C-alpha cells in the first residue's frame, strides 16, 4: 500500500505524522493538542490530511472486509445457536414435549405451511395420518394439540357454566376478522360481544324474520320457473351463493344486495367468498402478509397479489353497509333497532368502542363469509346427492307434496318443514358430509384438562375436527355415503353425539338457527311438487367430495362445478 503513495518530502511526512498523532489524540477525547496547532495551519498539513485520508480509506477497506466477514460469521453462529437452543427446548423441555407426533411439527410450523400451501390444502389429511400412527392425541405444532376421540368433544367444547374458553391468539391472526365476536380472544370479551348479537340469531329472532328468508327463497324459485322448459344450464353454487348472500345481507344490514337478480346469479360474489376462504391458511402461517396487503392501494395489490384483494373487497362491502346504517339511524325519526343486526347494535347502549367502524367491519366480514359460503355449500350437497339418486328424489318429492298444497299462496314454514323426517335426513346428511375439516382450537385459560392419562396444560390450544367426527366409521355405517334414511326411526344415538356441524359450547356457531331455517326452506323449494325439473348436467361425486382443507372443505383441484339442466 505504501508503494502506491506518491513520494513525500520531509515537511509532508512530518505533517502526516502530525495529522495521525492529532487524530489519535482527538479520538481519545484529548482536545488540548497545543504543539500541533501551528502544524494544522500549514500547507503541509493540508496535503498530509488528503494523503492521510487516502491511506486511512485503504486501510479501512481492508479492515471493513475483515470485520464484515467476522461480524457475519458471528451473527450466523449466534442465529444457529439460537435455533438449536429453541428446537432443543421445544423437543425436550417444552410442557408439550411429552405428547406424541412428528418431530418436525414439534420443532416448527413449517410443516403445516408445507401441507397447506405447497401440497394444496392437505394439513387436515396429514393430521389424520398422525392420529393413525400415534393415537388419539398428537402434537401438531410447537404449541398446539389435536384430539381424535368423539367422547372428548363435549369435554373440550364446553358451555360457559362449565369452564372458560379462550380463542388461541395465533389461530386468529392475519385474517382481518380479529375484532369479530367469533375471534375475540378472551372468554369475557367473546361473551359480551355475543350477548348483543344473540337476540337476532335466537330461534325466536329467526322466526320473527322468517318471512324475509322465505321471500329470497321464493325469488330463487321464480328465477328457476322462468327458465322452466328452456333446457338452460346453470351453476348451482353460483345460484345458492347468491341466495345465501342475499339472506345474510338482509339479516345483517337490512340491505337488498340483489345477487339473485343478476342473470348469471352474480358469479363474482361466489368467487369473492371462495378466495377469501382459500387464502386464510396463508394468512394464518404469515399473519403480517394480510396487514401488509391491506396497507397497499387497490391497484398495487391487484398487480402484486390478486387473490389478496378479496379480503379488502369484503371489508369494503361491510364498511359501506355500516356507514349507510349509521346515516339511516341519524336521520330516521323512528326506532330502527329491529331492521337488522347492525341496526340493533348501533342503536343499543353498547360501549362506543364496540360501535367503531373497524370493529363492526370485522363482524360484517365474518357474517357475510360464513353466512354465505357454509349454507351454499351444504345446499349444493343436497342438490347433488338428491339428483344423483332417483329413489331419494322421488321419496323427497312425495314427502313434500302435502305441505306444498297451498303454494304459492301459502309457503310452508320452517317449523312445518323440520318435522318431515326424510327432508330432515337429507339436510343432516348434507351437513355431515360437508363438515369443517380444520381443527377448531380452544384454550382453557385457568384449568388443566384431563384426557385419559394425559394432562393438557392450561392455555394450551387443543382442537378437534368436525369432519373426523362426521366420518367416524365406528358410528356411521358407510360414512361417505349420502343416506338420509340413517336418521329415520331407530338409529344409533351415538350419531347425535358425533353430529356437530355447528360445533358446541360457549363458542358454537352463532348462526345455527338461521342456517337451519334457510336449509329447510331452500331444500324444500328446490324439490317442491310442480317445480322446475332439475337434472345433473355433468361431473360426478369426485367433483364435490371434500379433498382439500382450507379451514372449510373443498373438492379436488380442477373439480367441475355442480351444474344442472332445467327441464
Swiss-Prot record:
Induction: The botrydial biosynthesis cluster genes are co-regulated by the Ca(2+)/calcineurin signal transduction pathway, which is under the control of the alpha subunit BCG1 of a heterotrimeric G protein. Expression of the cluster is also positively regulated by the cluster-specific transcription factor BOT6. Pathway: Secondary metabolite biosynthesis. It is a multi-pass membrane protein. One of its GO terms (molecular function) is oxidoreductase activity, acting on paired donors, with incorporation or reduction of molecular oxygen. It is an enzyme of class 1 (oxidoreductase). Heme binds at residue 509. Its EC number is 1.-.-.-. The keyword Iron applies. Cytochrome P450 monooxygenase; part of the gene cluster that mediates the biosynthesis of botrydial. Botrydial is necessary for colonization of plant tissue by the T4 strain. It is a strain-dependent virulence factor since highly aggressive strains like SAS56 or B05 still retain substantial virulence when botrydial synthesis is impaired, since they produce also botcinic acid. The first step of botrydial biosynthesis is performed by the sesquiterpene synthase BOT2 which catalyzes the cyclization of farnesyl diphosphate (FPP) to presilphiperfolan-8-beta-ol (PSP). Belongs to the cytochrome P450 family. This is Cytochrome P450 monooxygenase BOT3. The lineage of its organism: Eukaryota, Fungi, Dikarya, Ascomycota, Pezizomycotina.
Amino acid at each position: 500500500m505504501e508503494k502506491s503513495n506518491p513520494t513525500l518530502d520531509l515537511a509532508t511526512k512530518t505533517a502526516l505524522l502530525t495529522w495521525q498523532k492529532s487524530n489519535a489524540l482527538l479520538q481519545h477525547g484529548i482536545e488540548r493538542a497545543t504543539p500541533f496547532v501551528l502544524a494544522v495551519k500549514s500547507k503541509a498539513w493540508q496535503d498530509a490530511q488528503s494523503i492521510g485520508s487516502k491511506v486511512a480509506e485503504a486501510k479501512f477497506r481492508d479492515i471493513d472486509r475483515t470485520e464484515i466477514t467476522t461480524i457475519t460469521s458471528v451473527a450466523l453462529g449466534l442465529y444457529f445457536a439460537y435455533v438449536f437452543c429453541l428446537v432443543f427446548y421445544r423437543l425436550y423441555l417444552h410442557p408439550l414435549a411429552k405428547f406424541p407426533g412428528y418431530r418436525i411439527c414439534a420443532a416448527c410450523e413449517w410443516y403445516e405451511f408445507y401441507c397447506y400451501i405447497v401440497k394444496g390444502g392437505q394439513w387436515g389429511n396429514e393430521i389424520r395420518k398422525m392420529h393413525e400412527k400415534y393415537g388419539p392425541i398428537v402434537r401438531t405444532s410447537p404449541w398446539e394439540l389435536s384430539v381424535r376421540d368423539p367422547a372428548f368433544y363435549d369435554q373440550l367444547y364446553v358451555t360457559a357454566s362449565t369452564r372458560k374458553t379462550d380463542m388461541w391468539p395465533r389461530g386468529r391472526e392475519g385474517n382481518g376478522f380479529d375484532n369479530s365476536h367469533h375471534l375475540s380472544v378472551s372468554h369475557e370479551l367473546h361473551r359480551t360481544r355475543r350477548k348483543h348479537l344473540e337476540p337476532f340469531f335466537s330461534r325466536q329472532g329467526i322466526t320473527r324474520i322468517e318471512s324475509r328468508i322465505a321471500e329470497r327463497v321464493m325469488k330463487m324459485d321464480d328465477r328457476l320457473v322462468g327458465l322452466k322448459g328452456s333446457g338452460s344450464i346453470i351453476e348451482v353454487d353460483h345460484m345458492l351463493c347468491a341466495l345465501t348472500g342475499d339472506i345474510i345481507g338482509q339479516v345483517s344490514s337490512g340491505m337488498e344486495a340483489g345477487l339473485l337478480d343478476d342473470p348469471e346469479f352474480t358469479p363474482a360474489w361466489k368467487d369473492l367468498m371462495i378466495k377469501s376462504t382459500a387464502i386464510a391458511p396463508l394468512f394464518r402461517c404469515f399473519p403480517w402478509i394480510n396487514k401488509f396487503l391491506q396497507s397497499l392501494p387497490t391497484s398495487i395489490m391487484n398487480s402484486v397479489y390478486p387473490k389478496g384483494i378479496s379480503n379488502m373487497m369484503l371489508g369494503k362491502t361491510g364498511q359501506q353497509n355500516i356507514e349507510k346504517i349509521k346515516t339511516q339511524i341519524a336521520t330516521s325519526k323512528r326506532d330502527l333497532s329491529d331492521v337488522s343486526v347492525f341496526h340493533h347494535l348501533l342503536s343499543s347502549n353498547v360501549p362506543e368502542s364496540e360501535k367503531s367502524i373497524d370493529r363492526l367491519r370485522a363482524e360484517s366480514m365474518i357474517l357475510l363469509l360464513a353466512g354465505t359460503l357454509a349454507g351454499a355449500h351444504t345446499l349444493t350437497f343436497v342438490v347433488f346427492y338428491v339428483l344423483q339418486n332417483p329413489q331419494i328424489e322421488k321419496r323427497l318429492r312425495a314427502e313434500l307434496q302435502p305441505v306444498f298444497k297451498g303454494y304459492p299462496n301459502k309457503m310452508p314454514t320452517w317449523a312445518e318443514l323440520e318435522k318431515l323426517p326424510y327432508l330432515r335426513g337429507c339436510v343432516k346428511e348434507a351437513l355431515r358430509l360437508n363438515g369443517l375439516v380444520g381443527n377448531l382450537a380452544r384454550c382453557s385459560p385457568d384449568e388443566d384438562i384431563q384426557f385419559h392419562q394425559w394432562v393438557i396444560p392450561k392455555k394450551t390450544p387443543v382442537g378437534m375436527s368436525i369432519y373426523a367426527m362426521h366420518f367416524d366409521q365406528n358410528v356411521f355405517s358407510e360414512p361417505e355415503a349420502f343416506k338420509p334414511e340413517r336418521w329415520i326411526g331407530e338409529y344409533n344415538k351415538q350419531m347425535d353425539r358425533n353430529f356437530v356441524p355447528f360445533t358446541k359450547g360457549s363458542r358454537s356457531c352463532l348462526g345455527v338457527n338461521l342456517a337451519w331455517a334457510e336449509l329447510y326452506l331452500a331444500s324444500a323449494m328446490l324439490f317442491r311438487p310442480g317445480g322446475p325439473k332439475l337434472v345433473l348436467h355433468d361431473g360426478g361425486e369426485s367433483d364435490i367430495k371434500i379433498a382439500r382443507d382450507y379451514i372449510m372443505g373443498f373438492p379436488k383441484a380442477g373439480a367441475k362445478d355442480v351444474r344442472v339442466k332445467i327441464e
